[in-house]
């Protein structure tokens, strides 16, 4: 039971994962009372992974994906709730997804999800993977937090840590993509013979 738009995992706690009707009612009422609505979704038993995606300045239909990262939860925890992210994060560890086929599958679904939503600039996809290896997209975090200090790296930073170009290459690509997107939006309509043209914004 979540905030309807995720919102930095606000009010998401271990108790948000409910297994009884009474628990569902309690959590849903709490979230709706505080935020006006609640998102209720099926809990997927399995691994939790994340994939950073960046817009491709040359071909927006083939965005860049970075090394998928899998979380290792401490005993008693099974998903990334607010305290895991902001309070007890030292107990949470992560590692690159080791299975090459799974890593490619995660990149593929993240790439396609970003394109399907007409993603711009960058975003980070959070995905659960069940025991059969089937990925379930939880959400995409558009313009997610990045460039945190190395001692408190965010999830996007963990993905970039395994890319040769790192944060610098990532930032340069985003700037190039922004300029390319701007150029694509300017469509010349006609010329007046004097070197001037009329343009419209897409």
Segments predicted by a language model, with ranges:
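Phosphate-binding site of ATP-dependent enzymes
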Residues: 16-108, 129-136
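Conserved anion/nucleotide-ligand pocket segment
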Residues: 1-25
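Conserved protein kinase catalytic core
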Residues: 8, 48, 145
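Short, glycine/charged-enriched secondary-structure capping and boundary segments
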Residues: 14-16, 55, 155, 167
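Short, small-residue-rich loop/turn micro-motifs
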Residues: 3-5, 72, 86, 141-144
């Amino acid at each position: 039971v979540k905030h309807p738009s995720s919102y930095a995992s606000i009010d998401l706690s271990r108790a948000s994962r409910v297994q009884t009707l009474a628990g569902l009612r309690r959590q849903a009422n709490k979230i709706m009372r505080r935020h006006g609505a609640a998102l209720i979704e099926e809990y997927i038993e399995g691994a939790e992974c994340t994939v950073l995606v960046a817009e491709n300045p040359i071909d927006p239909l083939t965005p860049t994906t970075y090394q998928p990262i899998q979380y290792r939860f401490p005993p008693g925890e099974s998903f990334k709730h607010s305290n895991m992210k902001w309070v007890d994060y030292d107990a949470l560890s992560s590692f690159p997804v080791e299975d090459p086929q799974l890593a490619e599958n995660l990149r593929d679904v993240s790439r396609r999800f970003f394109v399907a939503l007409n993603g711009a600039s960058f975003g980070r996809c959070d995905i659960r993977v069940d025991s059969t290896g089937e990925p379930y997209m939880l959400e995409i975090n558009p313009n997610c937090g990045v460039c945190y200090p190395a001692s408190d790296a965010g999830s996007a930073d963990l993905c970039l840590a395994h890319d040769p170009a790192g944060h610098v290459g990532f930032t340069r690509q985003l700037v190039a993509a922004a300029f390319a997107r701007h150029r694509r939006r300017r469509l010349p309509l006609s010329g007046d013979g004097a070197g001037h043209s009329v343009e419209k914004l897409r």
